[in-house]
Amino acid sequence: MQRIAESYLSTGSRIDINYEGFKVPLYSTEAIVLIGVVIAAIVFQLLAFFASATTPVTGALYSVTQGYFISFLVFKVLGAYDLEYLGAMALMITVLIVLTMSLLYAKGIIRVTKKFKMVITTLFITVIAASLFSFIGYFIPFTRPMIVAMQHNFALSVISGVIFIIIAALFLICDFDTIDHVVNNKLPKKYEWQAAFGLAFTVLWIYLKVLDLIITIAGHGRD
């Protein structure tokens, strides 16, 4: 979302956005809806994670918001250049990642231990901290040039994208372990919903990161 906001030209009621080298016209109403969807996604995500009683509803609503955002990227951004097939490519890669991690977990090749959870949690906190630094830094005049330079560095964008995908893939192992724990211990329904949402959240996260990486590569040199 920040990348969409960082480079635009307002022309009446229309905004020409630049997303990873893809220039796409966006009407102000669409921009407002998109921003609203992103904000709603954050709210629903937090409620689903921390207010377990609301997970059946907020989890579903979160998935809807992500579906809207994915549709925007595939049909609005890529569709403007007849590259919708890249969305299908991202889906196939995501399915391959999920199947691979499922196999690694089922075969016991990767086991969920306290050390594994600690490493994953540390990586997740690092990712969140880096994202917050990037977002906040963009609005600070002193750090904005550095943030913009980092975001427009192709090699850095690709490397960070791959790292994020690896971290998200490892989170799948934790999700599988959580589901096993809930089922084997016959925990209450609310835990089943939370486990299901956790898995859905991770899969959507992987897809968006894979799609963003593909868009970054496809859009390289279009600026």
Regions picked out by a protein language model, each given a short descriptive name:
Residues 1-223:
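A hydrophobic alpha-helical transmembrane-helix feature that marks the membrane cores
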